[in-house]
Amino acid sequence: MDLILLVGIATALLLILITLYFLQSKNAKTETKAAAQPQRGVPQRAQEGVPRRAQIARNQRNRLRQNQNAPAVAAAAAPAAAVDSDDDEAAAAGDENGPRVPQGAVLDEKMGAKKRAKMEAKEQKRLQREQELHDREQRKVKEAKEDAERKQQEDLDAEVERKKAEADRLAKEERERKEHEEYLKMKAAFSIEEEGFEEGDADDKESLLADFIQYIKDNKVVLLEDLATAFKLKTQQAIDRIQELQENGTLTGVIDDRGKFIYVSEAELAAVAKFIKQRGRVSIAELAESSNNLINLTPVAAGESSA
């Protein structure tokens, strides 16, 4: 009985020892695996057991190298930074709490993927702003050039218009000057032609009157200016004299609107009156055609020479 109890107790103790051994082995494996994986949120150098002072010294050396490379990077980015200073300041004001991407610097290989993507996005936005600003400047230059060309063309058109107006004005003045000179010449000629003798001896007057009447009868159609010139009278005096002779029955005829006097003898007037009486009702066209046959407008001298 005692032997069986002792064997049972020994078996139980053995099972307990085996169980404790397996549990201890499992815990050791878990700790080893956890130690092999980097802890999230804890710097890698702290996980590796690097002293904090050594980490600080290494960080200082890294910043010193970045500061030494900063002048070259700034000189390369100076033109774009000078043009885009306002946009960069606004972007810097909006991203005060976030890291900035140094131009030309190589991203740290140990930097997290999220941080790397964020910095690359900022760099892409900066390049896009620079391109937009460059395009804007190009448009401004193009618009300024087009405005200058348009203004130059407008100036040329205005100059052409001004020269044309000046040429028209000079041509008009020259034309008016010539017309005025011709008017003065005609006026002087009329003054000379209209000069005549208003007074004379009685015998001379009668002789001149007879010659005046005979001149009209011989020429049949006389220009009043030529008639006045031939007898050294004024044109109006010649017209007045013809009207006086018509009133007293010495001359018969008509003065047309062209300044001519057409002499018609009494015999010719009688022939026209007889034609109208014979025909009764006569149209103007028929009267004009018959008048050409009934009234002789050929000068006497020309008729005699032809005869």
Curated annotation (Swiss-Prot):
Keywords: Endoplasmic reticulum, Membrane, Transmembrane, Transmembrane helix, Ubl conjugation pathway. Residues 1-2 are lumenal. SUPFAM superfamilies: Winged helix' DNA-binding domain. Residues 52-83 have a biased composition (Low complexity). Residues 107-175 have a biased composition (Basic and acidic residues). The chain crosses the membrane at residues 3-23. One of its GO terms (molecular function) is ubiquitin-like protein ligase binding. Coiled coil: none annotated. Residues 31-175 are annotated as: Disordered. Its main location: endoplasmic reticulum. It is a single-pass membrane protein. InterPro entries: DDRGK_dom-contain, DDRGK_domain-containing, WH-like_DNA-bd_sf, WH_DNA-bd_sf. The keyword Membrane applies. Pfam families: DDRGK (PF09756). SMART domains: DDRGK. It is found in: Endoplasmic reticulum membrane. Residues 24-307 are cytoplasmic. Belongs to the DDRGK1 family. Substrate adapter for ufmylation, the covalent attachment of the ubiquitin-like modifier UFM1 to substrate proteins. Required for ufmylation of Atg9; protects the nervous system during aging, possibly by stabilizing Atg9 and supporting its function. Interacts with Atg9; the interaction is transient. PANTHER family: DDRGK DOMAIN-CONTAINING PROTEIN 1 (PTHR48176:SF1). This is DDRGK domain-containing protein 1. It comes from Drosophila virilis. The gene is Ddrgk1.
